[in-house]
Design a protein with these regions (language model features):
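Exposed, low-structure sequence patches enriched in small/polar residues
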Residues: 1-174
Length: 174
């Protein structure tokens, strides 16, 4: 590819008989997943330092052949000349089968989900920084979630920092 463009492809396979959860948390053992990421970074704009556009996606199925997950994610991160940034994220997750959260009581179908998020971050090269964001997300079992969050970080030197974060969510599907 060319400068400012990267492409990644990954394939994962976990057998049903091999249990490697002792190495750390894994979502599931019987899994076949294909994932890809395409990132384009551009610079040289008069009003911004850089813009990074990111497209990612994955599809996965379990050993029984059920489609257990997938999604496409679009992210655009714009870094301004003063090093503050705006990030926009949107995603889509199609209907899938969930055979883990029923705790052995069968397989059920989850709904398709969409999400939209917008975040702002002040420049991180100063002692006092702040950021915040807002998002709207559809829940896996129905209903919507609105989430608002942010925070302030004080970093007077490289050896000390203090952080205050807040988060508020309103869930309609729970």
């Amino acid at each position: 590819l060319r400068q400012g463009v990267s492409q990644r492809l990954g394939i994962e396979y976990f057998d049903t008989k091999v249990n490697i959860n002792d190495l750390g948390y894994l979502q599931r053992n019987d899994n076949f997943r294909i994932r890809s990421a395409h990132v384009r970074t551009s610079s040289g704009m008069s009003w911004a330092r850089s813009n990074q556009f990111d497209v990612r996606g994955f599809v996965q199925k379990n050993a029984a052949g059920y489609f257990t997950g997938g999604g496409i994610y679009l992210t655009n991160r714009l870094t301004f000349n003063n090093l503050s940034s705006m990030t926009f994220v949107t995603s889509f997750t199609p209907k899938a089968y969930d055979d883990l959260n029923s705790f052995g009581n069968g397989t059920y179908r989850t709904a398709k989900r969409r999400e939209v998020v917008m975040r702002y971050s002040s420049p991180s090269n100063i002692d006092l920084t702040f950021g915040g964001g807002v998002g709207l997300r559809e829940e896996a079992l129905g209903g919507n979630q609105i989430k608002i969050g942010g925070g302030v970080t004080w970093r007077p030197n490289d050896r000390f920092s203090a952080e205050l974060k807040y988060s508020w969510a309103d869930r309609k599907g729970w």
